[in-house]
Amino acid sequence: MTIYVGNLSYRATEADLKAVFADYGEVKRVVLPTDRETGRMRGFAFVEMNEDAQEDAAITELDGAEWMGRQLRVNKAKPREDDRRGSWGKKQDY
């Protein structure tokens, strides 16, 4: 499972997030997406931990918590469903 962390301060770093989530267990990975054109952080992150129970505890404790002056939104990440092709090239039944 992957955790979505939204409403992040643009000052937050991978090390900052690892430190916060380490209180709930071992952090496997942190991803901080950046804007392709500006290189600026986009204000959200994805965190993976070793065990689902650890992730559940982190979500319960951190969702709505204030951190770096922002109220965090923390929940289970949803799989991306768009395939970025639009309708062109999709097989359709006629």
UniProtKB/Swiss-Prot annotation:
Gene3D superfamilies: 3.30.70.330. SUPFAM superfamilies: RNA-binding domain, RBD. Residues 78-94 have a biased composition (Basic and acidic residues). Pfam families: RRM_1 (PF00076). Residues 2-79 form the RRM domain. InterPro entries: Nucleotide-bd_a/b_plait_sf, RBD_domain_sf, RRM_dom, SLIRP/GR-RBP-like. Keywords: RNA-binding. Residues 73-94 are annotated as: Disordered. This is Putative RNA-binding protein RbpD. One of its GO terms (molecular function) is RNA binding.
